[in-house]
A protein has these predicted regions:
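Glycine-rich phosphate-binding loops of nucleotide-dependent enzymes
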Residues: 1-122
Length: 122
């Protein structure tokens, strides 16, 4: 129940996973991993297919896990605003090659990242 409370799902403890919303199901998947008490949590596209509200809640959950539990999270994500809002260090790849690596403010200013992911010209 502690993990469900952390996830904000305690009120849905009796709901079958198949009846949860997409966002709640993704949070439950994180909860399953948390049950193993990992030192590092690997997430692949943790906000994929989510509404803006679900995306914000998922990002807040990730930040909470880092801040309150000291959990390290390594994640892949195409929503650059989510990345810039959460990550302390970012590695950006394009076509299998690293095009930038650094702190969020450095990566955001990188001209290759701007051209490829942020829609600005070189």
């Amino acid at each position: 129940l502690r993990i469900l409370e952390t996830l904000g799902l305690a009120d849905q403890a009796d709901v079958r996973a198949g009846h949860l919303s997409h966002g709640d199901l993704k949070r439950l998947e994180i909860g399953i991993a948390l049950g193993m008490e990992p030192e590092l949590l690997l997430l692949d596209e943790p906000t994929a297919g989510m509404s803006p509200e679900e995306t914000a809640a998922q990002a807040a959950l990730m930040q909470k896990l880092v801040a309150e539990q000291g959990l390290n999270i390594l994640f892949t994500e195409h929503d650059m605003e989510v990345v810039f809002g959460i990550a302390k260090s970012i590695t950006v790849m394009h076509q299998g090659r690293v095009i930038a690596d650094g702190r969020p403010n450095e990566v955001r200013r990188d001209r290759h990242v701007q051209a490829v992911y942020l829609g600005e010209e070189l």
